[in-house]
C-alpha cells in the first residue's frame, strides 16, 4: 500500500464510504485520479503532522495512512474546527476518486496509546496488536468493549461522560470509560476487589506503594478536595496514573 495512492477502500473498511470501491474495482491508475487540488493552507499539514504514519484497526489491518496533507493518499481540500492543543480535533474534507468526503478526526494519547478516533466511533491504533504495560483486573487501555464484556459481563449502568461512554460495575466498585469503542480509562473505588495486575495494588493501597512499584518520580499526592483528580503520573508506554480521595485510575491521559 503506497501513501501516494488514494485508497478509498481503506476508508470504506471503517464504514466511511459508500459505495465501496472494493465492490466496483477500478484500475490503480484510475483510483489515483482526483479532480480537486490540495488545499494550500498549511493548517491541515500542521494538524496532521503528529498523526503522520500508518494506523491500524482493531483487527490489526492497515486502515489509514497519513502523510503531509494527505489521508490515504487523498489530498485534504478543506479543514474546519481544528484545535491544535491536546487532545486535538478537526474536520477534514478529502478528495477521493468518487468525490469528496469529510472526516472528523480526534487525536489523543501518548506513545503506544496514541489513538485516532474517526467520526467519533472508530478507533485506530499505531500497532497491529494492542500494546500496553499495565492492566487492571485484566482490562488494558485500548481493549475493546466486546473483550471487556466477555470478562465482566454488561455493566450495571452506562452513561455519557465528557464525550466518553462510562460503564459502572457496582459489584466490583469499578468504572470503565470508552471512546471509539476502546478503553480509555479504568477507575477503582476504595473497597474494590480489583487490583492492578503488575503491581497487585488496589484502590486502598498507600501512595508510597504505587511510587515504589512504578518507579515514579514522586509519591502521588491525594487532592485535598473531594471530586478533584490529581495530575497525571507517568507510567511506561504512555500510560497515566491518577488518584482522588475516592479512587485510583489508569488512563490514556
Predicted regions and their residues:
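N-terminal helix-cap/turn-to-beta initiation motif at the start of protein domains
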Residues: 38-56, 66-68, 136-146
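Bacterial N-terminal signal peptides
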Residues: 8-15
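N-terminal glycine/threonine-rich, aromatic-flanked beta-hairpin/loop signature
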Residues: 54-100, 186-188
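Beta-sheet ligand-binding and adhesion/scaffold domains
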Residues: 27, 33-46, 58-61, 72, ...
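N-terminal signal peptide c-region/cleavage motif recognized by signal peptidases
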Residues: 17-19
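A cross-family detector of function-defining hotspots
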Residues: 57, 143-191, 200-253
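Positively charged n-region of N-terminal signal peptides that target proteins for export
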Residues: 1-5
Amino acid at each position: 500500500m503506497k501513501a501516494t495512492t488514494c485508497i478509498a477502500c481503506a476508508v470504506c473498511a471503517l464504514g466511511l464510504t459508500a459505495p465501496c470501491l472494493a465492490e466496483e474495482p477500478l484500475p490503480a491508475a484510475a483510483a489515483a485520479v482526483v479532480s480537486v487540488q490540495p488545499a494550500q493552507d498549511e493548517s491541515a499539514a500542521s494538524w496532521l503532522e503528529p498523526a503522520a504514519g500508518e494506523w491500524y484497526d482493531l483487527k490489526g489491518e492497515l486502515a489509514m495512512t497519513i502523510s503531509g496533507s494527505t489521508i490515504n493518499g487523498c489530498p485534504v481540500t478543506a479543514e474546519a474546527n481544528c484545535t491544535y492543543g491536546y487532545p486535538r480535533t478537526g474536520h477534514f474534507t478529502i478528495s477521493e476518486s468518487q468525490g469528496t468526503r469529510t472526516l472528523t478526526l480526534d487525536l489523543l494519547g501518548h506513545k503506544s496509546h496514541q489513538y485516532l478516533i474517526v467520526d467519533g466511533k472508530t478507533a485506530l491504533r499505531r500497532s497491529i496488536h494492542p500494546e500496553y504495560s499495565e492492566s487492571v483486573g485484566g482490562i488494558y487501555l485500548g481493549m475493546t468493549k466486546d473483550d471487556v464484556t466477555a470478562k465482566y459481563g454488561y455493566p450495571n449502568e452506562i452513561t455519557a461522560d465528557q464525550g466518553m461512554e462510562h460503564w459502572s460495575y457496582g459489584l466490583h466498585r469499578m468504572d470503565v470509560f470508552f471512546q471509539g469503542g476502546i478503553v480509555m480509562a479504568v477507575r477503582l473505588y476504595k473497597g474494590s476487589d480489583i487490583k492492578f495486575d503488575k503491581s497487585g495494588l488496589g484502590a486502598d493501597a498507600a501512595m508510597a506503594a504505587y511510587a515504589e512499584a512504578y518507579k515514579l518520580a514522586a509519591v502521588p499526592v491525594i487532592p485535598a478536595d473531594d471530586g478533584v483528580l490529581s495530575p497525571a503520573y507517568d507510567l511506561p508506554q504512555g500510560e497515566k496514573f491518577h488518584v482522588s480521595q475516592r479512587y485510583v485510575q489508569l488512563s490514556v491521559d
